[in-house]
């Protein structure tokens, strides 16, 4: 059993993840066989979490071989089996030759675990499990046999599997219709850091950085711990970002392509969709995506959109005011920044520093800040004192006509208490001063929105901005103000 001292030590070494650590501890201390799946976006810190929470508790652990550098598909199964065999040798396997099939490999693992079984809890950890399942390898049937035929009959076994290919994890484990149906005893999804957790991370690393720049780092790196780990103390946000993404030897060289190849079997189709979604903040319909990318509208496109959504790169939502039709919107900040700026400017080692005050970067900040707000709805609701009110978020786009100007609202909070928060998001380096022209635009949006509401509903014009509002003659209609400090709660 993990002691209280051990748990406190683990929690102090990991930013956030309190619930996840407690859940892994509960599973470790149970008196029955446990089969837990841990999944989440690549680079989000799944492996680090597991290895810290269960430090020194592993009986056997193995990591699948990344497909990124395996060009020869015919040898992928052989490579995976060879790597698995070496892991077993490192853990004490003796008297067996390299297996030629996964059924043979798991039989050898069973023999090894029986040899190592002391009656205490045995933790068996497979990292990047989806990588092990190569085409025509019959891996899954052998893995099913390993759990159903061996692990499940031993009360001291805790099987932990981890994977970045979220769709594979969900389809083959969580929603399995085969031999693993209903076999998971728990599943844990690991999410990116919130802004508050990013701040805690930088403090832990003794990196001095303002909240304004933490928000900017979130706009680029999306709260992914692995990316933040490349920040260096003593450098500005601009300099750090240039070193991580730009120049001849950036720390995340070719990360976009490697990211997609590591997760998706149809990575080229996935990247086509991402590049399209970058071009319009509120997203595209399925039909528009098919038309623009040339991908057929059949089941293949539906499957690709589904795996992108399950992997948290895109989200599907119903635009406000539309009874039919769903939109797909990009929600991965890193992909947005990479496609917009890194791909075209990677050789410029000082791109961020050179363009920091340019109109190009200002336009990006506007879109990226809206993304950050979507990702921190909980914090915004808390600031608006509606944490207990059921609410959904949406966007609204109304094309203009010859008679009437259109409008676009990127963030609506539609509440069950008959109030709709129309959120204006402004990322500024100082307090926001509403001009006469901007007030007119805001009021136009409010009036158009009111036309769609019932008589019992009210619109609250809400400003989400960096450093608050300059109260003047054009700001009176704003009901609530949310600052970036509020996003850190």
Q: Residue ranges of each PLM-predicted region?
A:
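A cross-kingdom feature that marks ATP-driven nucleic-acid transaction machinery
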Residues: 320, 326-489
């Amino acid at each position: 059993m993990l002691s209280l001292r051990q748990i406190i030590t683990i929690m102090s070494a990991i930013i956030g993840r309190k619930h996840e650590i407690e859940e892994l501890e509960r599973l470790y201390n149970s008196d029955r066989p446990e089969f837990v799946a841990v999944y989440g976006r690549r680079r989000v810190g799944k492996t680090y979490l597991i290895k810290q929470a269960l430090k020194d508790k592993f009986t056997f652990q193995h990591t699948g071989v990344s497909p990124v550098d395996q060009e020869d598909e015919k040898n992928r199964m052989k490579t995976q089996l060879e790597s698995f065999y070496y892991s077993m040798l490192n853990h004490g396997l003796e008297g067996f030759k390299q297996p030629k099939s996964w059924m043979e490999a798991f039989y050898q693992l069973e023999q090894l675990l029986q040899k190592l079984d002391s009656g205490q809890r045995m933790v068996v950890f497979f990292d990047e499990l989806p990588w092990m399942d190569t085409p025509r390898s019959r891996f899954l049937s052998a893995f099913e046999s390993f759990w159903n035929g061996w692990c499940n009959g031993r009360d001291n076994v805790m099987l932990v599997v981890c994977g970045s290919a979220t769709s594979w994890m969900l389809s083959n484990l969580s929603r399995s219709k085969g031999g693993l149906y209903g076999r998971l005893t728990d599943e844990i999804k690991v999410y990116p850091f919130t802004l508050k957790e990013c701040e805690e991370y930088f403090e832990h690393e003794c990196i001095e950085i303002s909240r304004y720049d933490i928000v900017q780092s979130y706009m680029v790196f999306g709260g992914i711990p692995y990316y933040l780990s490349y920040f260096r103390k003593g450098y500005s946000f601009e300099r750090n970002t240039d070193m991580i993404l730009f120049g001849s030897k950036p720390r995340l060289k070719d990360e976009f392509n490697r990211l997609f190849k590591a997760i998706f079997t149809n990575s080229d189709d996935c990247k086509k969709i991402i590049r399209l979604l970058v071009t319009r903040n509120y997203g595209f319909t399925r039909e528009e995506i098919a038309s623009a990318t040339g991908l057929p509208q059949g089941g293949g496109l539906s499957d690709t959109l589904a795996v992108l959504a399950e992997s948290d790169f895109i989200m599907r939502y119903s635009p406000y005011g539309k009874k039919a039709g769903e939109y797909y919107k990009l929600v991965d900040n890193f992909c947005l920044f990479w496609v917009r700026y890194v791909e075209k400017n990677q050789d410029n080692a000082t791109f961020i520093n050179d363009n920091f005050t340019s109109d190009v970067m200002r336009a990006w900040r506007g879109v990226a800040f809206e993304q950050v707000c979507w990702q921190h709805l909980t914090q915004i609701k808390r600031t608006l004192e509606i944490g207990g009110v059921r609410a959904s978020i949406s966007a609204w786009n109304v094309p203009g006509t010859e008679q009437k100007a259109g409008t676009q609202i990127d963030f609506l909070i539609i509440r069950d208490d008959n109030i709709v928060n129309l959120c204006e998001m402004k990322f500024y380096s100082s307090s926001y001063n509403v001009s006469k022209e901007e007030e007119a635009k805001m009021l136009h949006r409010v009036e158009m929105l009111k036309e769609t509401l019932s008589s019992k509903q009210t619109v609250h014009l809400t400003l989400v901005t960096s450093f608050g509002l300059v109260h003047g003659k054009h700001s009176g209609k704003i009901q609530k103000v949310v600052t970036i400090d509020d996003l850190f709660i």
